[in-house]
A protein has these predicted regions:
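Mature extracellular or lumenal effector domains of secreted proteins
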Residues: 1-128
């Protein structure tokens, strides 16, 4: 992810026929990078709510109209993932800024761990 003149990478070790086969059907497929690895893509400004932490391919809040992300992590301010108000990743959309499709969004009203953020980035996805 390219943010503020820095490029940072994370490795997701996943077997599949193609990246398309992992995301096209819309089914959730978990990953296990952990919230700190996702936040590291943003740098020291990365911010997520402390709960839910649903990460992977096609991660979304239980109410899919709220937050969805093709590759990344979503967070919530208390247990459960019904109304997620923060996210980091690629191919994102939803509350509170539907125009931020790559980067970090965290609504400051709902206790994200590093304050409210709306950081837009450029995504690089390399497939081997």
């Amino acid at each position: 992810m390219h943010i503020n003149q820095k490029i940072r990478f994370a490795v997701i070790d996943r077997q599949a026929d193609s990246l398309h086969s992992l995301i096209a059907d819309g089914q959730y497929r978990n990953t296990s990078l952990g919230r700190d690895a996702w936040k590291a893509l943003i740098g020291s400004q990365g911010s997520l709510q402390r709960y839910c932490n649903k990460e992977g391919f096609n991660a979304l809040s239980l109410l899919s109209s709220v937050v969805k992300i093709r590759i990344g992590i979503v967070g919530h301010d208390y247990g459960g993932c019904s109304y997620c108000d923060s996210r980091i990743g690629f191919g994102a959309g939803g509350y509170p800024d539907d125009s931020n499709v790559c980067g970090n969004v965290a609504d400051g009203r709902y206790d994200p761990d590093n304050g409210g953020k709306n950081i837009k980035g450029i995504g690089y996805i390399l497939v081997q």
